[in-house]
Each structure stands twice: as structure tokens, then as C-alpha cells.
Amino acid sequence: MAARLLWAVRRRMQPLAAHAASEGRGWLHPFSTATQRTAGEDCNSEDPPDELGPSLAERALKLKAVKLEKEVQDLTVRYQRAVADSENIRRRTQRCVEDAKIFGIQSFCKDLVEVADILEKTTECISEETEPADQKLTLEKIFRGLSLLEAKLKSVFAKHGLEKMTPIGDKYDPHEHELICHVPAGVGVQPGTVAFVRQDGYKLHGRTIRLAQVEVAVESQRRL
């Protein structure tokens, strides 16, 4: 009797056990889904660094842009200063050139003042009220004054590199001589040479600044 009762209980429990087993498998599915979700979230947890990547790169570019902008501003300031300095140098140079043009002959003029003083003293010797007896003395003073004036003038010219050209007997040179006419070659005068100087020429430090006006000797008797 007890054995039959135990068999009946087991038989009734089998469907419940089967149902419980099927339910148990269903219960496992949610846990597996949650596990999958958790794993997926864990896998996706590495995505944020990828999302932060562009942000860091953008930051670096902005910093670089700011740095370049500062460099551009610095270079602009330097350029403006260089332009200003160049303009100042140009103005100073121009002023120096203008001063050189104006005051370049200052030393020469200072020496000429002494010549003017001698000339003034010489002319003071001449007076309308000079007595006939004093004319000889006056002429002597004038002669001495003019001689002193000539000597002083030559000294001033030599000091400043001004040289007088008196090319009598020199071969005609169109770079130094201005031909006025031809004259017959006389005794001791070679054709093609300067026979007579009408006006002296001048050189300044070896450079001709005024041609000498000359007459050149030729073999022909014809005067041009």
C-alpha cells in the first residue's frame, strides 16, 4: 500500500518536474541576455576614447593656431619697426647728402674769403683823390697787392686740388682742349700741337672741369 502510494506521488510529480525544468530554462535566458548586455556594454566602454580623440586633436590645432597667430603678430611688429628704421635712415642719408651739397665747399669758400680780403685792401689803394706825385707809389702798392692775391689764389687752388692747365706745346687732346682755330706751325712748333692758349683750362683732382681754349698748329698756311 505504501509502495503504491509512493508510485502515485512520483507519477504526479513528473509533469511538475518537467514543467519546472522548462521554466528553469526560461529563467536562464534573461540572465544570459543580461550577461550579453553587460558584455556588450563592457565592449562599448572603449568607445569614449575614440569620441574624445577628435576633441583632443581639435584642441591641439587651436593651440597651434593661437601660437601661429602670435608669431604673425610678432613678425608684423618687427616688419613695421624695420620699415620705420629704414625710413629714418633714408631721411638721415638724404639730409646728409643735402648738407654735403650745401656745405661741401665750406672750406673752399673760407679760403676764398682771405683772397677777397687781399683784393679789398688792394682796391683801397686806388682813390680818385690820389695826387699825381703819389700815383707811382699807388701803382706799386697795387702791384704788390695783385701779386700777393695771385700767390694766395694759387695756394688755395692747390690746397683744394684745383690745377690750371696751360698746354702750350702739348699735343692737341679733345678731352682737355677746345679747338678755337688752326694756325700755321712756326719755328719749333710741331703740327698738331697747341700753339697758343686763349683761355686756361682747369682740373679738379685730375678731372677736367673746364677745357682750355687753344689754337692748334698745322702745316697749311690757311687759317681756319
Swiss-Prot record:
Modified residues (N6-acetyllysine): K141
Record-linked CDD domains: GrpE (cd00446)
InterPro entries found in the cross-reference section: GrpE, GrpE_coiled_coil, GrpE_head
GO CC annotations on file: PAM complex, Tim23 associated import motor
SUPFAM superfamilies: Coiled-coil domain of nucleotide exchange factor GrpE, Head domain of nucleotide exchange factor GrpE
Pfam families: GrpE
Subunit structure of this chain's protein: Probable component of the PAM complex at least composed of a mitochondrial HSP70 protein, GRPEL1 or GRPEL2, TIMM44, TIMM16/PAM16 and TIMM14/DNAJC19.
Function description: Essential component of the PAM complex, a complex required for the translocation of transit peptide-containing proteins from the inner membrane into the mitochondrial matrix in an ATP-dependent manner. Seems to control the nucleotide-dependent binding of mitochondrial HSP70 to substrate proteins. Stimulates ATPase activity of mt-HSP70. May also serve to modulate the interconversion of oligomeric (inactive) and monomeric (active) forms of mt-HSP70.
UniProt-recorded name of the protein: GrpE protein homolog 2, mitochondrial
Organism of derivation: Bos taurus
Lineage, top ranks: Eukaryota, Metazoa, Chordata, Craniata, Vertebrata
